Regions:
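Glycine/tyrosine- and acidic-biased, solvent-exposed loop/turn segments at the edges of beta-strands
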Residues: 1-166
Length: 166
């Protein structure tokens, strides 16, 4: 403690390896890391004014499992990415327009190819994103197979594409 404020603390696994550490970086920012029993980083959380703003979770092999970054003043995320143990993506969500809370979203096949992609918009009434515009769907080889047009988060129309259309 320094002047009544927690500055640093550490917890340890039963075998003596570091399990968790917290550091106050300054009066506003702090950082917490947790570790797997094998010593690999498990998670890292960055705080601003006591609120988690960035979080990264790791598999025990060291690969990133999940990464998120929250908007500092709005109730939505700027980024949410999910990965497989081999490091290949499962899904990604990245803000492309903060003013309209619009995101580029993609989902991936186990082989790493894009399964579908399109845009989504944060809906404050649902406290979640919903798909908007045209979404493209791909087969495992990466060929675009069909498109869906979304209106208010619901499929409005489906457009099949030719089997050989890239």
């Amino acid at each position: 403690y320094n002047e009544g404020q927690l500055v640093i603390y550490k917890n340890f696994h039963a075998d003596g390896r570091l399990e968790r550490e917290f550091k106050a970086l300054d009066n506003v920012k702090s950082l917490m890391r947790t570790y797997h029993a094998n010593g690999q980083l498990r998670s890292e959380t960055k705080y601003v004014h006591g609120q988690a703003v960035e979080y990264v979770d790791h598999y025990s092999n060291g690969q990133i499992r999940y990464a998120e970054e929250k908007h500092r003043t709005e109730p939505y995320y700027l980024r949410m990415d999910l990965f497989r143990p081999d490091g290949s993506p499962i899904s990604t969500l990245h803000v492309v327009d903060k003013r309209n809370a619009t995101f580029e979203q993609s989902e991936f096949w186990p082989n790493g190819q894009v399964r579908c992609k399109g845009q989504a918009r944060y809906n404050p009434n649902r406290m979640d994103t919903q798909r908007i515009g045209t979404w493209s769907y791909f087969d495992m080889a990466g060929q675009r197979r069909f498109e869906e047009a979304y209106v208010d988060g619901k499929v409005h129309a489906v457009k099949p594409l030719l089997a050989n259309n890239p």
